[in-house]
């Protein structure tokens, strides 16, 4: 059984036992969270596609860790004007493990 969920403006295909990194979510490490924005649920034979969400479907997940991604460097430069600017950014993420997919 798998599902397609939406969180943090992105869509993920998940199955029970999967670990994935998503945009930062509120919740302590080890706590259970419920993801209600389920776009598609499939159990192999039957596939339910939401419009836009599947009614009564949810995904249970456990927060494994919080962290920050690799640094991305932004470099701006104006030629012939002696203007150079460097800026860095590290995106925060939450690593979750999918426990259960529930569909009615």
Curated annotation (Swiss-Prot):
Show which residues constitute the signal peptide.
none
Q: Which UniProt keywords apply?
A: Ribonucleoprotein, Ribosomal protein, RNA-binding, rRNA-binding
**Residue stretches in coiled coil:** none
Q: Output the Pfam families linked to this UniProt entry.
A: Ribosomal_L21p
Which domain of life, per UniProt? Bacteria
For this chain, one GO molecular function annotation is: structural constituent of ribosome
> What cellular component terms from Gene Ontology apply here?
cytoplasm; ribonucleoprotein complex; ribosome
GO terms (BP aspect)? translation
Family label: Belongs to the bacterial ribosomal protein bL21 family.
**What is the documented function of this protein?**
This protein binds to 23S rRNA in the presence of protein L20.
Assembly description: Part of the 50S ribosomal subunit. Contacts protein L20.
Q: What is this protein called?
A: Large ribosomal subunit protein bL21
Recorded source organism is Methylobacillus flagellatus (strain ATCC 51484 / DSM 6875 / VKM B-1610 / KT)
* UniProt gene name: rplU
């Amino acid at each position: 059984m798998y599902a397609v969920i939406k969180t943090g403006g992105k869509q993920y295909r998940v199955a029970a036992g999967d670990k994935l990194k998503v945009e930062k979510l509120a919740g302590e490490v080890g706590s259970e969270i419920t993801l209600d924005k389920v776009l598609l649920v499939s159990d192999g034979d039957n596939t339910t596609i939401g419009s836009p969400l599947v009614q009564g479907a949810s995904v249970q997940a456990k927060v494994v860790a919080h962290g920050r991604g690799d640094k991305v460097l932004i470099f701006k430069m104006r030629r012939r004007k002696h203007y150079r600017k460097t800026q860095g950014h590290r995106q925060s993420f939450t690593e979750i493990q999918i426990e259960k997919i529930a569909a009615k």
